[in-house]
Amino acid sequence: METVSRSSFQPHAGLQKTLEQFHLSSMSSLGGPAAFSARWTQDLYKKECGKEPPEPILHLPSQPPPVIPGGPLFMPSDRSTERCETILEGETISCFVVGGEKRLCLPQILNSVLRDFSLQQINAVCDELHVYCSRCTADQLEILKVMGILPFSAPSCGLITKTDAERLCNALMYGGSYPPRCAKKSDFPPGPLELELTEGSFKVYHECFGKCRGLFVPELYGHPSAPCIQCLDCRLMYPPHKFVVHSHKALENRTCHWGFDSANWRAYILLARDGVGGDDELARLGRLLEEIKEKFDYSNKYKRKAARLSSEPVAKKAKADDSIIHSPSSAEKDKSSSWLRNLSNINKNAGYVHPRQRLSAFRPWSPAISANDKELSTHLPALIRDSFYNYKSFENLVAPNVALTPPVQQKVITSPPCVPAVPRSTQSSGSPPQSRKRRPTAELPIVPEAPAPPVPIREEEKESETEIEVESREECTFTSSLSSLSSPSFTSSSSAKELSSPGMLAPTVINTSYEVASHNDQHCSGLEAELEHLKQALDSGLDSKEAKEKFLHEVVKMRVKQEEKLNAALQAKRSLQQELEFLRVAKKEKLREATEAKRNLRKEIERLRAEHEKKMKEANESRLRLKRELEQARQIRVCDKGCEAGRIRVKYSAQIEELQSKLQHAENDREQLRTDLVHEREAREHLEKVVKDLQEQLWSKTSHLPSSEHTRKDIEN
């Protein structure tokens, strides 16, 4: 387990100067806010006030500062691919958490929240506010495509921070302007844009995006989105979460804003001190503002935060009768490293801070040094263990994308395992709170400490320490006051040797070293010093030598049990590390399989799309061909109809002419037959006449009757 003492680390002068320069430059850069602004703003406020309160000092012997190689190391930017969602103007937007700041998908914002605005308007506002749009990585682009947020044909995607998205939406959708009757020196009579002065109204302000002052009207705060704050510049009413974005000054357009969220307006709106009668009135308005902030706080975040702040005491001053006197060199050294101690206490101390200490309301909180009401236990393992967790919290405070090179050597100062119970007034007020109280078994004289050898820092342990520190801490908690005498590298064989050694009777002080938890346990040389302190306790509290030996044997047994517990905890830690590594490998494998499946799916979709386009092209060509054939058939049909009528007309005309000719021939034949009949009638009449003449001749010739009959028959024939 890593044992890095927060108080023993002494910063190099060049490193401290580099950190101060980084703090000044990071306010206007894209790397995030200054993570080291807490102590810097406190020193600035103390210099302005002209008084320097006493700082809490851990009473440790002086030692030379370690060698710090080089300056800051700028590491690669955070390329996180874990997709999450956030709410922006009532719309759910996909985002990635990069460097602690949410990066929102810009195309999704344009298509949902800002769909009523043109690209020219959006670009103009982005140029005015200096909104920076970064390009997403290839993995982030693939995730957005797989989730269906972006089309597969999208070549890239822009990402903007949640803070810039809030500023952009506020400027486009809720941008206030100066009404014609809101000038500071106006000669117009009072109108509807006057201040909403009521009995409970009071002035507030915020320091976000250039600052703004307003008048809070509690009577109008009927629901979370009620416009209850009136801007003192434009006289327009805004709800609290919109007032913190509202501003009429372009003072911070070139500042990198980081970590802003309008949902946290309760932390941004502050009470204005001008126009307040006295301290009582100021306290009353402060309580009223706190009550208003707790109203409609459904998640109870602000209530929990306020309760946590009120439960911790304010920093106490050291009493004048302090019996411990520090040398000028140690005081100077503690003063130079005070900024590091305060940084490690940020997660534990959150006392009251004067508003002048904060340059902006949404920048990291600058806590004052608060005193701990618990008793201080100076036992080294517990101190190192708590310092280790504070060191881990200190690592998380570094600004995103920027890391500092760790020192090559870090030293830990040992302390006696048992110290006499001292009054609270003589304890250090700035000591980190322990996990539990420990009662010393006997009154012991204070033994001077000796510097410890350097402790190596293993990079492989730093990587996985964050994931399992909670489990390791639960398994490694000590269950009694005597159990705090154990060390990670103690063994039963060495303890037996020390018990049988006659040199135990001589009071000696041995240097001890505490190593970082690793795969190979090393023997510790601090057993002699601890047993010497135990002998002093036995000499002062036990009479017989047998009782002392029995007490020492009990202590050794207890330490062996604790070592077994520690080994079991280390084994559990290793197993958890292996399981975590297995989960990481499995996650990478699943991600690779998902990526491969996505690529195959995309290829299949592209193939189906190509086939569909080909079939659609063929269908369109077939449709056009059939359409042309249909038109040709229609034209042919129309032509055929016209030609057939002509042919029928010609045919019928020919037939009519033929019939007419036939009729003419028939008429001619009829005339010819009529003529023939006339000729035949005439011939018949002539014949009848001849016959009649012959009959007459026959009648006249009666004598020749047979011959005449025969002649008549011949004539008839």
From Swiss-Prot:
GO terms under cellular component: cytoplasm; nucleus; transcription regulator complex
Composition-biased stretches (Low complexity): 477-495
Key words, A-Z: Coiled coil, Nucleus, Proto-oncogene, Repeat
Location in the cell: Nucleus
The keyword Phosphoprotein is assigned to this record: no
Annotated SMART domains: c-SKI_SMAD_bind
Renumbered ranges of Sequence repeats: 527-550, 551-575, 576-600, 601-625
Parts forming coiled coils: 524-700
Tissue specificity annotation: High levels of the protein are found in the lungs and ovary with intermediate levels of expression in the heart, spleen and brain. Low expression levels are found in the liver, kidney, testis, intestine and blood while no expression is found in muscle, skin, stomach, eyes or nerves.
GO biological process, alphabetically ordered: negative regulation of BMP signaling pathway; negative regulation of transcription by RNA polymerase II; negative regulation of transforming growth factor beta receptor signaling pathway
Region ranges (Disordered): 415-502, 698-717
Residue span of region 4 X 25 AA approximate tandem repeats: 527-625
Bias (Basic and acidic residues) ranges: 707-717
Ranges of biased composition (kind: Polar residues): 424-434
Disulphide-bonded residues: none
One term of GO molecular function: DNA-binding transcription factor activity, RNA polymerase II-specific
Family in the record: Belongs to the SKI family.
Function: May play a role in terminal differentiation of skeletal muscle cells but not in the determination of cells to the myogenic lineage. May function in TGF-beta signaling.
The protein's name in its UniProt record: Ski oncogene
